Amino acid sequence: MNVARTVRDYARAGVAGIQLEDQVHPKKCGHMENKAIVPLAEATLRIRVARDTTADVAIVARTDAIATDGLDEALRRADTFLAAGADVLFIEAPTSTDELETIATRFVGVPLVANLVEDGKTPLPAIDVLGELGFALVLRPVSALLRVTETLRAVYRELAQGGAPDPDAQRVRFDEFNRLAGLDEIDAYVDQLSGAQE
């Protein structure tokens, strides 16, 4: 019921795709330990219900079975999800290049997702290498966040030690930051609204 309603609402909102997973709730990052997955029948039902609800939303079926039951079970689940109507497969956290190649060979012609997390479970091949294997979507969910976090830590360390951040350090200029944030457009919109009230 929840899957059907969510997918129907997403379709009405114009969403192009939705990811459905086989992890239990509360879920964990795919590159963390101690994950658990729901039975295959339950996970498959989620996919089937989503597909029966609409054909207008792409269904990305994710399995975390490599971590809990190994690659063979993850492949079995992916086969079942495809048969139930999934459009894209996301087999989370392969632990070697061989596993990535096995997935790509097994699902030739099926759009595949690779999730690359620095210091995570999956090796970090170049995006073009993954593309050649057949991965259509490559996620780098924390790459920028990890780099920014180190920069924040350095700046706050300098401040905590009574100093000031290095003014010559690589950074975005304040006016460029405001431009990136869309401040000019916001100001123009506020001016437009102010003029409408006069």
Language model: regions and residue ranges:
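Alpha/beta enzyme core
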Residues: M1-R157, Q192-E198
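Extended, intrinsically disordered, low-complexity segments
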Residues: L145-E198
